[in-house]
């Protein structure tokens, strides 16, 4: 079994830091297309997959120093919030959600 490596507490050198997240990460993909694109609809279908991947990539590049990736986490939270608000609005208006 692999040992768990503690997160880094030293700042990542500027050359190794990931570029700041763009506003595009805060906008979810069309969830209807995302759901229909899969063979089976599951709870793991995520229209905010790009923001999720960017967050994980940031963690890997900074040796899991969470304080350097807060912008990416915020972008992911915004994306999820926008997606859930969009689904809620569609349900309230009687639109198809899947």
Curated annotation (Swiss-Prot):
InterPro entries noted in UniProt: COX23 (IPR051040), Cys_alpha_HP_mot_SF (IPR009069)
GO biological process: mitochondrial respiratory chain complex assembly
Intrachain disulfide bonds: 48-79, 58-69
Motif placement: Cx9C motif 1: 48-58
Annotated Polar residues bias: 1-13
Keyword set includes Mitochondrion: yes
Principal subcellular localisation of the protein: mitochondrion
Record region (Disordered): 1-27
Subcellular location: Mitochondrion intermembrane space
SUPFAM superfamilies for this protein: Cysteine alpha-hairpin motif (SSF47072)
GO cellular component, one term: mitochondrion
Domain of life: Eukaryota
Keyword Disulfide bond appears in the UniProt entry: yes
Domain CHCH: 45-87
Annotated transit peptide: 1-18
Annotated PROSITE patterns: CHCH (PS51808)
Motif (Cx9C motif 2): 69-79
Keywords, sorted A to Z: Disulfide bond, Mitochondrion, Transit peptide
Family, as annotated: Belongs to the COX23 family.
Function: Required for the assembly of cytochrome c oxidase.
Alphabetized PANTHER family for the sequence: COILED-COIL-HELIX-COILED-COIL-HELIX DOMAIN-CONTAINING PROTEIN 7
Protein name, entry field: Cytochrome c oxidase-assembly factor COX23, mitochondrial
Species of provenance: Cryptococcus neoformans var. neoformans serotype D (strain JEC21 / ATCC MYA-565)
């Amino acid at each position: 079994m692999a040992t768990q490596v503690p997160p880094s507490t030293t700042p990542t050198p500027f050359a190794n830091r990931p570029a700041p997240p763009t506003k595009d990460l805060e906008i979810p993909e069309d969830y209807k297309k995302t759901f229909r694109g899969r063979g089976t609809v599951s709870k793991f279908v995520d229209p905010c997959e790009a923001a999720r991947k960017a967050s994980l990539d940031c963690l890997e590049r900074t040796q899991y120093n969470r304080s350097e990736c807060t912008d990416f986490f915020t972008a992911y939270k915004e994306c999820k919030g926008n997606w859930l608000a969009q689904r809620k609005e569609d349900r309230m208006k009687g639109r198809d959600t899947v």
